[in-house]
């Protein structure tokens, strides 16, 4: 049985865990050193609901310097992973401020999975550091509410470091991409 090919693009603030999530899923190893992404591609196979799916994983740079380069990733996208870091409330604020408008402009009608990365970041040390800035880790209810607000296909939390929830993120993304094909034929991602 031939694999069904789907393109997944991951977006979100710089250093929110996008690359780690992709590397842990595709290579089953956690990168210990942070290297800012410019543009990377990975391929991974996954079976969902009895179907073999070959996911082309397109990593993107979250930093503002790449705002003009990032749209080159969007054509022919089947599903978007829109990420924030649970230990960075600011990265959640950027979901409706920056990422949703950008994605909905270039990829109208493409399903979005909202992903809370760094699930294990709710530890005591992180809480203390955030408290110094009068902040706290993102609460699951706040993230779910954000998912509803941006009309995401779903919301999941994961930890690339412990691998908790990683496979579920890509299973849900694959399901979203497979369902979307029925309605997508007239509305592919656009590059304007």
UniProtKB/Swiss-Prot annotation:
Keywords from the UniProt entry: Cell membrane, GTP-binding, Lipoprotein, Membrane, Methylation, Nucleotide-binding, Prenylation
Membrane topology designation: Lipid-anchor
Keyword Nucleotide-binding: yes
Organism: Diplobatis ommata
This protein's name: Ras-like GTP-binding protein O-RHO
An example Gene Ontology biological process: small GTPase-mediated signal transduction
Family matches, as Gene3D superfamilies: P-loop containing nucleotide triphosphate hydrolases
Cellular localisation: Cell membrane
Motif Effector region, residue numbers: 34-42
Lipid attachment, kind S-geranylgeranyl cysteine: 189
GO CC, alphabetical: plasma membrane
Keyword Ribonucleoprotein in annotation: no
CDD domains associated with the record: RhoA_like
Location of Cysteine methyl ester modifications: 189
Molecular-function GO term, any one: GTPase activity
Similarity-based family: Belongs to the small GTPase superfamily. Rho family.
Residues annotated to bind GTP: 12-19, 59-63, 117-120
Database matches in Pfam families: Ras
Propeptide: 190-192
């Amino acid at each position: 049985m031939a694999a069904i090919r789907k393109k997944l693009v991951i977006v979100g603030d710089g250093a929110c865990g996008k690359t780690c999530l992709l590397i842990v899923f595709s290579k089953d190893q956690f990168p210990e050193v942070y290297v800012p992404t410019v543009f990377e591609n990975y391929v991974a196979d996954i079976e969902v609901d009895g179907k073999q799916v070959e996911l082309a994983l397109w990593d993107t740079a979250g930093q503002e310097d790449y705002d003009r380069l990032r749209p080159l990733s969007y054509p022919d996208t089947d599903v978007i992973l829109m990420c924030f870091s649970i230990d960075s409330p600011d990265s959640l604020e950027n979901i409706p401020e920056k990422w949703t408008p950008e994605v909905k402009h270039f990829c109208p009608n493409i399903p979005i999975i909202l992903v809370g990365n760094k699930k294990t970041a709710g530890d005591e040390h992180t809480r203390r550091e955030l408290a110094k800035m009068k902040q706290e880790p993102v609460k699951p209810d706040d993230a779910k509410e954000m998912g509803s607000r941006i009309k995401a296909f779903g919301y999941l939390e994961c930890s690339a470091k412990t691998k908790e929830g990683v496979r579920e993120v890509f299973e849900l993304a694959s399901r979203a991409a497979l369902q979307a094909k029925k309605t997508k034929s007239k509305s592919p991602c656009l590059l304007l």
